Amino acid sequence: MFIFFIFYFFYTMRIGGIAMDLFVKPRKRENIDAHNAYILGSDFTSLVTACYLLRDGSLKGEHIHIIDSVDSFHHYEPYLSFVDNRSLYLWDILRSIPSIETEGLTVLDEMTYLNHDAPMKTIHNIQLSDQLMSELVHFFFTSDEQLEGKQVKDVFSQDFMESDFYYYWHALFPVNDAYSFKVTLHRYMHILSSQGMISPKYCIYESVIVPIIEYLEAHHVVFHFNTEVTHVEIEDNEATAFTIKSEGMEETIDLTKHDLLFIHTSQSKDSIAHVVITTHDEKIIHYLRNILQIDPLSGEDITGGVIPINESAWELNWTIPRQPYYKNQKENECVILLHGLHPEKTGDYVEKSMLESKGYEICAEWLYHLGIPQDKINELSLMSASTVPYTHTSTYCEAHVNGLNYAYIGEGVSLPYEYPGSLDYLVHTAMNAVYSLLHITRSIPTYRYSIEDYLSVFSSLCGDETFMETQSFTKRLVLKELLKRIEGSDLEALLKEYKFF
């Protein structure tokens, strides 16, 4: 089976590398000062689009207009709050965003230093047996055509579907079709190693989005709130006008040949509910301390990602991020993030759906699955503040073709072999849109895995044992003969480093 990993390493070399002009400042386009850019929507993708227009497109801030029907910036906390250490597109933009906490540093500097000094840890046991590992490797080699129209349950055994690995992975990436599952494995397999994920100092909104907003405001980008876009006119593959409605008045804005239009779009299905639990109850914190064997208020990363509750009807998963999660959080408070993949189903403790439940009832359901004695659940749940669930939808992309002066951004944009539920994906769509309309020649980063990446993941899935120790006696004899052929080589040293034998 190890040979499969070696072959797969060479197979995925096609993913790409890094070109020299990735590090070059793009040339300023002729007549760029005559351009105006209109971005329809003010979510994270729209903000990043404005950043690329400023930095790489050389547009003036006062020529960039962000238009949205919301009334303020407080609408931006993305669902997927974890960030992996291969978020190349996110890093590319954050390296240019000044920190609002430490003068002279960027947001990328700040996040990097934090995770070097206090890296995320994992408490998950997601090891796979040799049989299940073989299933996973075989799946890696399955062509996209063979997976068309199939669900994950159609290509894996029941044992695999009930494994801790699958529950963990499905909690992170709630996809059911086989192709999307394969995409997430190829793109994010490195997070299975001990330092595959990183975390910001506070929530994504305060650590990433607020600095971006301040960067845009400092460059005089124009925000139009309480303004609804009611119509976009497109003729012969060119956007000619769009209509807005504000304070009951409609206005049509005509676009010239120098104007650019960015349209936020998404395609959705399968609602997911999210709840933020805030507690200062020492009894709950004591239970969490015993369960996790770490103090939730220590300031370190606590759970190392999501913890799925396998037997939950709502398919709950939860995580305790680095505390404090908010800048203004009280010293003795603990914030827990709770997600329900099936909020429409009836709960196991609460006899109603998650969407129908009040905050304290959702908290009670979570405490029930933690194993808290039932005679104490109701009392403890009332001692915690819990927001009612808000819904997010797992996105299914469609192909959107850009026009001569307009481009699509956001989760609804189809990118080959990418998972749309990450911050990195959103930045990628913004970068593509700006670069295509302004014909920027700077290279777009591409992912590339090394053999060390695959061996590191392989080692994580084998657990404390070496790969050789997980094999049958007959297989060990064959593998020992193969190892004799590489004795004394760099490959032998590499295999030892990653616990192959």
Predicted feature residues:
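Helical element adjacent to the flavin cofactor pocket in flavoenzyme catalytic cores
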Residues: 187-259, 265
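Active-site-proximal substrate-binding core of FAD-dependent oxidoreductases
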Residues: 436-492
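Glycine-rich active-site loop/strand segments that organize a redox cofactor
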Residues: 69-92, 173-178, 183-192
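C-terminal segments that line or cap access tunnels to active or ligand-binding sites in enzymes
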Residues: 190-198, 258-260, 265-428, 435-436, ...
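Dinucleotide-binding Rossmann-like beta1-alpha1 core, especially the glycine-rich loop
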Residues: 76-147
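Rossmann-like flavin
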Residues: 123-187
